[in-house]
Every structure is written in C-alpha cells, then in structure tokens.
A protein has these predicted regions:
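Acetyl-CoA-dependent GNAT
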Residues: 4, 8-11, 22-32, 36-99, ...
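Hydrophobic pocket/interface hotspot
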Residues: 17
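Structural motif
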Residues: 20, 120, 143-144
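Conserved catalytic-core motifs of GNAT/GCN5-like acyltransferases
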Residues: 84, 126-129, 141-164
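Active-site acidic-Proline motif in GNAT/NAT acetyltransferases
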Residues: 97-99, 103, 131-132
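Conserved GNAT acetyl-CoA-binding A-motif
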Residues: 117-128
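Helix-turn-helix
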Residues: 136
Length: 173
C-alpha cells in the first residue's frame, strides 16, 4: 500500500481540490444523484468555494499527497448541527481521487483531521453520509471506526431526487 503525506491546504491547492471534488462526486454518486445535477457541478464553481475556504480556514482543510501531487482532501471543523456541544467536531468532506480509493489515502486524511480536531479540543466527531453510498459507509464504519447515530436521518434534495443522509459518530480518540 502506498504511503501518503498529509499537510494543511495552501491557496495553490484550490484547483486540485476543486478537480477532485467534482471528479469524486461524478464517480461516487453516479446512479444516486441525477446526471443533470452531477454535470452541473463544475470545477469553476467549486474553485471559488475552495479558494475562500482555504483563505479563511472555514472549514480547516488538509490535502493528501502522492509524492507531490494532491490526490485527496478533507475538510473539518466544529459540528454544524444545531444544538451540538462545542466539543463535537465534524468531517465536512473527505474525498480521494478514484484512482487512490482503497489504498490508504482516506485513512491518512482521517488521521490528520482527527489530530486537528483533538487540537481544537473536540472529544467527539460526526459526519453525514448518503445512506445509499455503500462504499462511503463501509469506509467510515469499518476502516475509520464510526458508528451510526440512530435515529439521525435527514433528507436532502439533489435536483429532483431526495436522498437520505445518515449521521455517523465516534470519539476523536
């Protein structure tokens, strides 16, 4: 299995992050989210978002590198869920290029995000995942040790389709 390095994202990484965000959504959510929604997701739109996120550290962003090439990213910070304690963090995003799926890059990003959440004083961490995304559920539950936070389903609209998301949680340590 390859070894990946992880570091905080820099402004120069915004384009690579936007490329990865679009490519992974189009690969992972094909058949789950309508094609017109996936096709409307452009690198240009994502680039503006990620430039601002990196500039303001909202959320905090890490990138995974294979040699010197950005091949994945994670965004994390305090939980955005209403009514949660300040000691609860959230993985806002964790995406790796399809060519690097199941090779350890996601775990390297999770480990880096977990360290960042610990530094922020978080003791618990949550994330939301599409209930129909079996691959993501398998990664977070089996590889990263998350458990389903029942009952925590919410419905999110993706174009004309409404999909259920499930919150997962675990201790930071």
């Amino acid at each position: 299995m390859p070894s990946y390095s992880v570091r905080p994202a820099a402004p120069r990484d915004a384009k690579a992050i936007a490329d990865i965000h679009v490519a992974t959504w189009q690969a992972a959510y094909q058949g789950l989210i309508p094609d017109d929604v996936l096709k409307a997701m452009t690198v240009e739109k994502r680039l503006a978002y990620w430039k601002e996120a990196i500039e303001y550290s909202d959320p905090q962003i890490l990138v995974a590198l294979d040699n010197d090439k950005v091949i994945g990213f994670a965004g994390f910070d305090r939980s955005r869920d209403p009514g949660t304690k300040s000691s609860v963090g959230e993985i806002w995003a964790l995406y790796v290029t399809p060519a690097h799926w199941r090779k350890g890059a996601g775990l390297a990003l999770w480990d880096g995000a977990r360290d960042g959440l610990k530094e922020e004083g978080c003791t618990q961490v949550t994330l939301w995942v599409l209930l129909a995304n079996a691959s993501a559920l398998a990664f977070f539950e089996h590889a990263a040790g998350f458990k389903r936070d029942m009952p925590s389903l919410k419905t999110t609209a993706f174009g004309s389709v409404r999909l259920e998301e499930l919150r997962l949680k675990r201790p930071v340590d």
